[in-house]
Regions:
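Conserved N-terminal subdomain of the carbohydrate kinase-like
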Residues: 1-78, 249-254
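Short glycine/serine/threonine/alanine-rich loop segments
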Residues: 19, 103, 237
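Glycine-rich phosphate/pyrophosphate-binding beta-alpha loops
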Residues: 33, 54, 79-81, 228, ...
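Glycine-rich beta-alpha junction loops
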Residues: 41, 52, 111-113, 141, ...
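Conserved beta-alpha-beta core of the PfkB/ribokinase-like small-molecule kinase fold
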Residues: 73, 79-157, 173-175
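Conserved phosphate-binding/catalytic region of the ribokinase-like
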Residues: 96-100, 147-254
């Protein structure tokens, strides 16, 4: 019952937020995967109940191809690639459909070593990066994946793999927006952080939403910096996500 309730909670949340969930499908028997997040002075730790979850059973033939083909942006997290081989294949197929339809592909290199080993993760992520228009890695994940420490070196690395735009998330240090011709470090928005569980995903969504609104990558990065920072001022990955008005007001205040 817990897992069905979690699935119901997602659908209720999406309805409340006005999201189109018309193409969401429910597996008749498989549970909804659940992540547990614990906090300590050293940060947060994830534990998962995802084995044989509905998401892990995703396969290419289950994709809403027409829906993906009509999108302006298609976003994929490496976590979706990590949970199973069939989900990995579905991610590959979805990227191909999106690219053929003219969508821009964005990709977060989310590294979860409880889901796959580093060598497998690195190989798949490096295979995916050249297929992306917008790369949204974090500094910590990238240091593990590339063996590099410096943010500029990491940006060069991913640009060299073929991604034309890299927005490198650096937590309390802000972000680095990089293309083949420019590097811009955007300072962080200062807050008293409580829980950074959803900060990376908040940055991704905020950055992409502003690109869809017509912002250039620098303006989108400034907006996303603020949104991600505000999302750390409460507990959880969803509840603290700020509304657009709150982000714009924070930007006005500087």
């Amino acid at each position: 019952m817990l897992f069905r309730s979690m699935g119901d909670a997602f659908l209720d949340l999406w309805k409340t937020e006005g999201l189109d969930a018309s193409r969401v499908t429910r597996h008749p028997t498989a549970p909804t995967g659940v992540s547990f997040v614990t906090h300590s002075a050293s940060g947060h730790k994830f534990d998962y109940l995802r084995k044989n979850s509905a998401a892990s059973l995703m396969a290419p033939d289950a994709l809403p191809a027409d829906y993906i083909a009509g999108a302006r942006f298609f976003h994929l997290s490496a976590i979706g690639q990590a949970i199973s081989e069939s989900a990995r294949a579905a991610g590959d197929a979805a990227i191909a459909i999106a690219r053929k339809g003219g969508a821009k592909v964005s990709y977060d290199t989310n590294l979860r070593l409880r889901l796959w080993d580093l060598d497998t993760a690195r190989a798949k992520i490096n295979e995916t990066v050249p297929l992306c228009d917008i790369l949204l890695p974090s500094l910590d994940d990238s240091q593990h994946l590339t063996g590099l420490e410096d943010a500029d070196a990491i940006a060069y690395y991913y640009l060299g793999l073929g991604s034309p735009l890299v927005a490198l998330k650096m937590g309390a240090e802000g972000c680095l927006i990089a293309t083949q011709t420019s590097r811009d470090r955007l300072p962080p928005f200062k807050v008293t952080a409580i829980d950074a569980t959803g900060a990376g995903d908040t940055f991704d969504g905020a950055f992409l939403s502003r690109l869809l609104e017509g912002d250039d990558p620098i303006a989108a990065g400034r907006y996303a910096n603020v949104a991600a920072a505000l999302s750390t001022t409460g507990y959880g990955a969803v509840t603290p996500i700020p509304r657009k008005e709150a982000v714009l007001e924070a930007l006005r205040r500087g």
